[in-house]
Regions:
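Active-site beta-strand->loop->alpha-helix modules in alpha/beta enzyme cores, enriched
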Residues: 1-19, 23-141, 147, 169, ...
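Phosphate-binding/catalytic loops
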Residues: 143-157
Length: 217
């Protein structure tokens, strides 16, 4: 594997359809980026919630971004499961976001995710941000829609533990779900670590469909 450092990144946009999407998909990467740099500004947006899930999303986002230099956390209240079917106000939300924040890197769900909300958020991400590095994260679930990612971020064991501990602590509404468990989250990062030949044994993985390599000084 040839490593690539994102040393010039200072503005990161994290997008999730649901309150725990970002944490599951790229929570370890977020923690690692904050650990490596105190210059990064985060904009964290969750699109759907109810009062219980909104509280979880807010508390979790604050925990993950606690050491970030600057952070903006936005939790919307669109109806879970219906994002593509109420598309106009969601699209308007993205248009407002484009004016409010200009990111260097965007984390968003995968285009191939079979959950309609995840897929729609990805579609709007690409429609709205056309000159940005977009990394599509993975969410393991019943649908069996995981593919072969092509972009990996090695994670230390300590960061993996921190990610999983925060997930289990802040998302009490999900603890009774069969897929929401410590062993799944740890095991998934361990699997991607093997695929990435990660020196730390763990990694998160993403789909990167377009990247511009600047060879000029």
């Amino acid at each position: 594997m040839i490593p690539l450092k994102l040393s010039g990144v200072t503005r990161i946009l994290c997008l999730g359809a649901h309150s725990d999407d970002i944490e599951i998909g790229c929570g370890g990467t977020v923690l690692g980026l904050i650990e490596s740099s105190d210059r990064i500004e985060f904009y964290w947006m969750v699109l759907s919630s109810n009062p219980e899930r909104a509280k979880e999303a807010e508390l979790s986002a604050r925990a993950f971004l606690r050491r970030a230099r600057t952070k903006t956390i936005v939790v919307k209240s669109f109806r879970d499961g219906f994002l593509p079917y109420i598309g106009t106000p969601v699209k308007e939300c993205f248009e407002e976001l484009k004016k409010a924040f200009v990111p260097d890197v965007i984390f968003t769900p995968s285009r191939h995710d079979l959950h309609q909300d995840h897929r729609f958020v990805c579609e709007l991400t690409w429609n709205t941000f056309r000159n940005h590095l977009i990394l599509e994260y993975e969410i393991p679930k019943y649908d069996g829609d995981l593919r072969s990612p092509n972009f990996f971020v090695p994670l230390s064991e300590a960061i993996c533990r921190s990610k999983v501990n925060k997930l289990m602590r802040y998302f009490g509404s999900q603890r009774n779900k069969q897929w929401f468990s410590e062993d799944l989250f740890h095991g998934f990062m361990r699997l991607r670590g093997v695929e990435a030949s990660s020196p730390t044994c763990y990694a998160e993985a993403f789909h990167c469909r377009k990247m511009l390599l600047d060879c000029h000084r």
